[in-house]
């Protein structure tokens, strides 16, 4: 018997804003989305700050958004957990961090803090780094070094010097710490197996090889002079008296203070995995601490804040009911519809199929704003036609990934591409008498100009995101206001005729 699939299409990075300037969503020709918002029940959802377990006013992101949607409850984020631990002083009792501190003291060796120097709060937070430096100083560690990855994506494109000055001031106040290397996140935080990028960052941190500067400021200013913003600063070794300030050596301790896993895995593997073959590198004997668990298969690392587990996520619960589901996305967002959507669990649920469509190999996605949306659409249409699936979770990466480039014309094209694809998906779901829910995980492409400066804005926003219900019975349904991302899973379960498990604290959006 043909199934009536219930599908969730996540339009990544598509928020709502009344501002027309720099708003790729409102500038785009989008007949299908216009029709949806005119003819079908729709509402708006909170996707940032307290609504998703982040500090008040903190912009949402893809990881957090998918965790909350999949869990059907507010998931308190690593950012909030770590900040609280520092404020409460609990961090001084953290076993993994104590191991790193003790190793440096016992061997009279160095402790290196590596990570994204930013207050973006997506991958890291500068306040966590300051807390770690305070911990090292109070513990009597003298050799304290920072390997700073520069942001410019979750912060303004040319804001690195502000964070460098802030950090250097803090280190001067506590009396320990120097910046040893700087590297744009494009290199140090690649997640697409572009090992040549990771290698440049590795060479700077471990071998002391690469671009050279006498100060972090010099490295950044030189990069700006070459028209490279923070994200693209070439990995640079900071030298003093003609020698590197510090390199990572055997018997040192390393703390990687990024809390978001996806862009932290590759460089962690490059330093730690015995079987690593991405490029030639040293074998080091280190105490290496990751702030959170980046991947349970990474060898030889200590985890400071171990994952919390979530029972009865949407995928797990639907699986327990004997239903079959599909997760589909292109490479850039595949981890989000699988690992993050399942509450940080790598293993698929029973009867959970996955379709990974490769993202195009381009330097930046403004060069191909369509990304792989057409290929994702072709595949999902085939899968819907197979009549196998009760639930389908799909992600279109374009509004977010192209939004991050700051190139507004490309972002408009990205929205138009997704709109075209959505039209085909909508027609197919209605033909099958199924239900299609449309939402986003956070905002981005709807504000691509910093209204205070007029400069391009490449970061996410705190704007509300859309939520719409498309089905043949949609005219009989109404959606309530003041919802959050955690309310989506209970809504979908109601649409599937399933009870909501007690672990889900989200509430259905149907009135």
Curated annotation (Swiss-Prot):
The entry's function note states:
Catalyzes the interconversion of 2-phosphoglycerate and 3-phosphoglycerate.
Tell me which GO cellular component terms the UniProt record holds: cytosol
Q: Which residues bind substrate?
A: 123, 153-154, 185, 191, 260-263, 333
Per its record, how is this protein called by name?
2,3-bisphosphoglycerate-independent phosphoglycerate mutase
Show the coiled coil region(s).
none
Pathway(s) where this gene product acts: Carbohydrate degradation; glycolysis; pyruvate from D-glyceraldehyde 3-phosphate: step 3/5
UniProt cofactor(s): Mn(2+)
The reaction(s) catalysed by this protein are: (2R)-2-phosphoglycerate = (2R)-3-phosphoglycerate
Asked if the record carries the keyword Zinc, the reply is no
Q: Does the keyword Secreted apply?
A: no
Q: What is its EC number?
A: 5.4.2.12
Record-annotated residues binding Mn(2+) 2?
Answer: 12, 62, 441-442
Which keywords has UniProt assigned to this entry? Glycolysis, Isomerase, Manganese, Metal-binding
Annotated catalytic residues: 62
What Gene3D superfamilies does the database record attribute to this sequence?
A: Alkaline Phosphatase, subunit A, BPG-independent phosphoglycerate mutase, domain B
Q: Do you know which InterPro entries this protein is assigned to?
A: Alkaline_phosphatase_core_sf, BPG-indep_PGM_N, Metalloenzyme, PGAM_B_sf, Pgm_bpd_ind
Q: Which family does it belong to?
A: Belongs to the BPG-independent phosphoglycerate mutase family.
Pfam families named among the record's database cross-references: iPGM_N (PF06415), Metalloenzyme (PF01676)
Origin, by domain of life?
Answer: Bacteria
- Top-level EC class, please? isomerase
Q: How does it assemble?
A: Monomer.
Per the entry, the cofactor note is: Binds 2 manganese ions per subunit.
């Amino acid at each position: 018997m043909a199934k009536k699939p219930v599908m969730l299409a996540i339009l990544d990075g598509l928020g709502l804003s009344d501002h027309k300037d720099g708003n790729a969503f409102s500038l785009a020709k989008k007949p299908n989305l216009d029709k949806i918002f005119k003819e079908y029940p729709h509402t708006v959802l909170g996707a940032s700050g307290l609504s998703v377990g982040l500090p008040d006013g903190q912009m949402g992101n893809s990881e957090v958004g998918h965790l909350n949607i999949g869990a059907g409850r507010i998931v308190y984020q690593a950012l909030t957990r770590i900040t609280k631990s520092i404020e409460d002083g609990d961090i001084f009792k953290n076993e993994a961090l104590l191991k790193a501190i003790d190793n440096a003291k016992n061997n009279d060796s160095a402790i290196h803090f590596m990570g994204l120097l930013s207050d973006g709060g997506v991958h890291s937070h500068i306040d966590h780094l300051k807390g770690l430096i305070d911990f090292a100083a109070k513990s009597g560690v003298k050799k304290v070094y920072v390997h700073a990855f520069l942001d410019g994506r979750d912060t303004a494109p040319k804001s690195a010097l502000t964070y460098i000055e802030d950090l250097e001031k803090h280190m001067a106040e506590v009396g320990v710490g120097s910046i040893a290397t700087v590297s744009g996140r494009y290199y140090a935080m690649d997640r697409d197996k572009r090992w040549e990028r990771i290698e440049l960052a590795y060479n700077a941190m471990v071998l002391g090889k690469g671009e050279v500067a006498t100060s972090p400021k010099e490295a950044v200013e030189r990069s700006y002079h070459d028209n490279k913003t923070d994200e693209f600063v070439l990995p640079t070794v900071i030298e003093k008296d003609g020698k590197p300030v510090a390199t990572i050596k055997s018997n040192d301790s390393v703390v990687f203070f990024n809390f978001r896993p996806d862009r932290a895995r590759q460089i962690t593997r490059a330093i730690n995995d015995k079987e690593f073959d991405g490029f030639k590198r040293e074998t080091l004997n280190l105490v290496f601490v990751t702030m959170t668990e980046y991947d349970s298969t990474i060898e030889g690392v200590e985890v400071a804040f171990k994952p919390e587990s979530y029972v009865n996520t949407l995928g797990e619960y639907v699986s327990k009911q004997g239903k079959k589901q599909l997760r589909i996305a292109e490479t850039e967002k595949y981890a989000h519809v699988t690992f993050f959507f399942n509450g940080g669990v790598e293993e698929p649920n029973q009867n959970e199929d996955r379709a990974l469509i490769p993202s195009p190999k381009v330097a930046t996605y403004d060069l191909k704003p369509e990304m792989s949306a057409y290929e994702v659409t072709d595949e999902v249409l085939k899968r819907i036609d197979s009549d196998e699936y009760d639930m389908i979770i799909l992600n279109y990466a374009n509004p977010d990934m192209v939004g991050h480039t700051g190139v507004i014309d490309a972002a408009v094209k990205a929205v138009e591409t997704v709109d075209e694809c959505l039209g085909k998906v909508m027609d197919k779901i209605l033909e099958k008498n199924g239900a299609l829910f449309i939402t986003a995980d956070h905002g981005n492409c709807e504000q691509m100009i910093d209204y205070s400066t007029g400069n391009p804005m490449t970061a996410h926003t705190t704007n509300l995101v859309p939520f719409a219900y498309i089905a043949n019975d949609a005219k009989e349904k109404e959606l309530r206001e003041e919802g959050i991302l955690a309310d989506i899973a209970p809504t979908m379960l109601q649409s599937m005729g399933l009870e909501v498990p007690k672990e889900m604290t989200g509430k259905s959006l149907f009135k």
